[in-house]
Amino acid sequence: MLPSMSLPSLXWMLLSCLMLLSQVQGEDSPADTPSARISCPKGSMAYASYCYALFITPKTWMGADMACQKRPSGHLVSVLSGAEASFVSSLIKNNLNALSDVWIGLHDPTEGLEPNAGGWEW
């Protein structure tokens, strides 16, 4: 676990934002496999009927979330299956260096400043 003093600075080290261009479906979705038929905007990649884009822009979690929501049906990614985790992981590994951090939908709204404030949120 990171000391609470390092957590606020982590937000400024952020180099990436992941965006999901459609509503997220759960593990029981029949579309858990990659689909070659979906058409995504330029700079996005299709997986399981959804479009994913990786943005290399320094932002806080809130800033990244707002930037994603400005796009059609965009949200920070919520990883709901092992297959989706593998896809997202490979997207990050193929586009960023090993020292980069990314934001996803799960976050600590207190940025570690209040350890007993209720925990993580989507």
From Swiss-Prot:
An example Gene Ontology molecular-function term: carbohydrate binding
Signal peptide (from-to): 1-26
Disulfide bonds: C40-C51
Domain C-type lectin: 38-122
Annotated tissue distribution: In pancreatic acinar cells.
Localization terms from the record: Secreted
Keywords, sorted A to Z: Disulfide bond, Lectin, Secreted, Signal
GO cellular component: extracellular region
Maturation-removed propeptide residues: 27-37
Quaternary organization: Cleaved to give an A chain and a B chain joined by a disulfide bond.
Record's function text: Might act as an inhibitor of spontaneous calcium carbonate precipitation.
Descriptive protein name: Lithostathine
Record organism: Sus scrofa
Gene field: PTP
